Amino acid sequence: MEPVDPNLEPWKHPGSQPRTACNNCYCKKCCFHCYACFTRKGLGISYGRKKRRQRRRAPQDSQTHQASLSKQPASQSRGDPTGPTESKKKVERETETDPFD
């Protein structure tokens, strides 16, 4: 380490600032320009304001699409399609026929 003049502010120490200014180029050399460029360009991390993305507009026939959704058959519930009452009756019949030892 080189001795640093104690009268200099920390941001003016030699080696604390790169010799060239940061730019918008994303080449390999510019991505490794300084710590800030590496995190922003190399890693893609930025803590600034997020750009507002515009929503995609719905096509003009969106009403027909909604109508086709309502015409679809309702989804059936999962499980035994015969229903819980018949399955209970089956269990009762099986328990009655099994002999108790």
From Swiss-Prot:
Sequence motif Cell attachment site, location on chain: 78-80
Segments of this protein annotated with the region Cysteine-rich: 22-37
UniProtKB keywords: Acetylation, Activator, AIDS, Apoptosis, Host cytoplasm, Host nucleus, Host-virus interaction, Inhibition of host innate immune response by virus, Inhibition of host interferon signaling pathway by virus, Interferon antiviral system evasion, Isopeptide bond, Metal-binding, Methylation, Modulation of host chromatin by virus, Modulation of host PP1 activity by virus, Phosphoprotein, RNA-binding, Secreted, Transcription, Transcription regulation, Ubl conjugation, Viral immunoevasion, Zinc
Annotated site (Essential for Tat translocation through the endosomal membrane): 11
Stretches with biased composition (Basic and acidic residues): 86-101
Region (Core): 38-48
Gene Ontology BP annotations: DNA-templated transcription; positive regulation of transcription elongation by RNA polymerase II; positive regulation of viral transcription; symbiont-mediated perturbation of host chromatin organization; symbiont-mediated suppression of host innate immune response; symbiont-mediated suppression of host translation initiation; symbiont-mediated suppression of host type I interferon-mediated signaling pathway
Region Interaction with the host capping enzyme RNGTT, residue ranges: 49-86
Stored InterPro entries: IV_Tat, Tat_dom_sf
Polar residues bias: start-end ranges: 60-79
Residues with PTM N6-acetyllysine: 28, 50-51
Miscellaneous note of the record: HIV-1 lineages are divided in three main groups, M (for Major), O (for Outlier), and N (for New, or Non-M, Non-O). The vast majority of strains found worldwide belong to the group M. Group O seems to be endemic to and largely confined to Cameroon and neighboring countries in West Central Africa, where these viruses represent a small minority of HIV-1 strains. The group N is represented by a limited number of isolates from Cameroonian persons. The group M is further subdivided in 9 clades or subtypes (A to D, F to H, J and K).
Biological role: Transcriptional activator that increases RNA Pol II processivity, thereby increasing the level of full-length viral transcripts. Recognizes a hairpin structure at the 5'-LTR of the nascent viral mRNAs referred to as the transactivation responsive RNA element (TAR) and recruits the cyclin T1-CDK9 complex (P-TEFb complex) that will in turn hyperphosphorylate the RNA polymerase II to allow efficient elongation. The CDK9 component of P-TEFb and other Tat-activated kinases hyperphosphorylate the C-terminus of RNA Pol II that becomes stabilized and much more processive.
UniProt protein name: Protein Tat
Source species: Human immunodeficiency virus type 1 group M subtype B (isolate ARV2/SF2)
Gene, per the UniProt record: tat
